[in-house]
């Protein structure tokens, strides 16, 4: 016992900085969640409809409950109880984002670059992902906790490649696979394929925890798909295998959310790729060609990023693009995806296998979305964005580690992260106070009219703070506490 305590003290002394960083990250997101303003579906699950579905196995009349009739048992359960219990909401929100940051850091070899970029992840989210995942409880619940669990499994797999793991890890991965598969249909299916890819192609040692994860994932898929809601005709849920319709949806929506809007990620990725090639000596003709192509992509996506800021988009971040531009941009996005894959295979030697796995996973979690005709939502690309971000971290570490400007570049990213983090908290605080003032207006709180004022920073409330998406009964109940 004494030796164990001594080892624990030594471990804390050696890693106290990391404990401090992730402790601050947890506190930041707890404060973040406290200041969030719920919207739309949050009130559906908080109120009588959510209570009815909870007590009827998430089954009910289609005309009333629509797509809420589903097998997302854990996601639905957490949405209901985080809306009813603020302390639980703070714990789940802060814990999930902190776990995701920690997993990214662990997967990227626990370097300082990995630490700052993992912490900065949420501040790189484009407006559509920010609005539908970060600042909306319903979006957060169904996307962030399961992805944090998927990344946790990958951390376990990586640790298992370097050292023997205790047999109890098999129980842990069984629980992870089961839990992660009860949030979203896409994750329930994709994590099984991901687990098989790891077993057959990306591990030297096949262990019990690999197979127990697969068992948990399979059980979760069976439980989810056994739900009667998937055998009902629900107009809101539609699939398509028509190649023209698939391409049309990719052109007008999916590629914009996946590629074009992610200016920060694309910029850092392409900049890192250019530096990686530039550090190679001597240059071949192919190297020079890649540098030119990199710079063309870089300039193009910076221009597109500025252009999209000026294009009108609705409350769901559907952009009203010029049809010709949308077609060209979609084609260029495919070239970028193919180009990135070739770059990984050709220029990344030490970490090629790991980055190639992320590349495949980004496609794996995006692929099923191509066949979804309705609902088409920006938050659906979140899982792929996570793996794209891991690719970027790998490339940035490879590019900037050891160069003369390393400390300067690190300082810039650190200051930018702290600045954006502070600004987000300021926006949320302004919104929180403005919302309190408007919901306390006598005519609203007495149910005589809807809200008639927007909060200052509308993108920090789901659907850009649509006034008809607030619920007077919720605010009456919350303000009484």
Predicted regions and their residues:
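Alpha-helical transmembrane segments
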Residues: 14-29, 114-121, 171-175, 212-221, ...
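Transmembrane catalytic cores of multi-pass membrane glycosyltransferases
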Residues: 32-84, 137, 185-193, 200-340, ...
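Membrane-interface micro-motifs in multi-pass membrane enzymes
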Residues: 120-158, 322-340, 365-392
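Transmembrane alpha-helix segments characteristic
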Residues: 116-124, 214-218, 285-309, 349-370
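Signature aromatic-anchored transmembrane alpha helix within multi-pass, membrane-resident enzymes
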Residues: 288-296, 345-363, 398-423
């Amino acid at each position: 016992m004494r030796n164990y305590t001594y080892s624990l003290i030594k471990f804390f002394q050696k890693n106290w900085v990391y404990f401090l960083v992730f402790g601050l990250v947890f506190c930041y997101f707890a404060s973040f969640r406290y200041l969030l303003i719920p919207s739309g579906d949050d009130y559906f699950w908080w109120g009588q409809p959510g209570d009815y579905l909870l007590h009827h196995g998430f089954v009910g009349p289609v005309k009333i409950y629509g797509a809420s009739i589903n097998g997302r048992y854990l996601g639905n359960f957490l949405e209901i109880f985080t809306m009813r219990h603020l302390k639980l909401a703070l714990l789940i929100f802060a814990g999930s984002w902190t776990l995701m940051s920690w997993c990214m850091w662990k997967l990227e070899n626990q370097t300082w670059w990995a630490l700052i970029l993992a912490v900065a992840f949420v501040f790189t989210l484009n407006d559509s992902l920010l609005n539908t995942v970060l600042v909306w409880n319903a979006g957060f619940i169904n996307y962030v906790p399961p992805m944090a669990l998927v990344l946790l499994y990958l951390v376990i797999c990586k640790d298992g490649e370097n050292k023997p793991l205790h047999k109890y890890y098999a129980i842990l991965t069984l629980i992870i696979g089961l839990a992660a598969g009860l949030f979203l249909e896409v994750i329930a299916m994709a994590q099984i394929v991901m687990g098989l890819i790891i077993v057959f192609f990306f591990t030297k040692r096949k262990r019990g925890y690999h197979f127990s994860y697969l068992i948990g994932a399979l059980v979760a898929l069976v439980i989810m798909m056994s739900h009667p809601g998937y055998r009902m005709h629900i107009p809101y849920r539609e699939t398509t295998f028509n190649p023209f319709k698939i391409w049309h949806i990719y052109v007008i929506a999916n590629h914009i959310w996946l590629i074009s809007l992610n200016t920060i990620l694309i910029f850092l990725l392409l900049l890192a790729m250019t530096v990686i090639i530039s550090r190679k000596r001597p240059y071949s003709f192919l190297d020079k060609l890649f540098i030119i192509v990199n710079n063309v992509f870089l300039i193009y996506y910076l221009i597109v990023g500025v252009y999209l800021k000026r294009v009108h988009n609705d409350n769901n971040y559907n952009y009203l693009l010029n049809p010709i531009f949308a077609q060209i941009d979609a084609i260029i996005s495919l070239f970028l995806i193919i180009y990135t894959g070739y770059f990984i295979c050709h220029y990344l030697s030490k970490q090629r296998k790991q980055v190639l796995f992320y590349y495949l996973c980004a496609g794996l979690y995006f692929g099923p979305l191509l066949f979804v005709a309705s609902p088409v939502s920006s938050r659906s690309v979140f899982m792929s964005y996570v793996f794209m971000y891991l690719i970027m971290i790998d490339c940035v570490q490879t590019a900037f580690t050891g160069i003369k400007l390393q400390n300067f570049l690190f300082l810039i990213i650190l200051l930018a992260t702290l600045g954006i983090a502070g600004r987000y908290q300021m926006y949320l605080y302004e919104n929180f106070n403005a919302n309190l003032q408007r919901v306390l207006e006598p005519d609203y709180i007495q149910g005589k009219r809807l809200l008639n004022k927007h909060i200052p920073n509308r993108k920090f409330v789901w659907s850009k703070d649509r006034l008809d998406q607030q619920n007077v009964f919720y605010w009456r109940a919350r303000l009484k506490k």
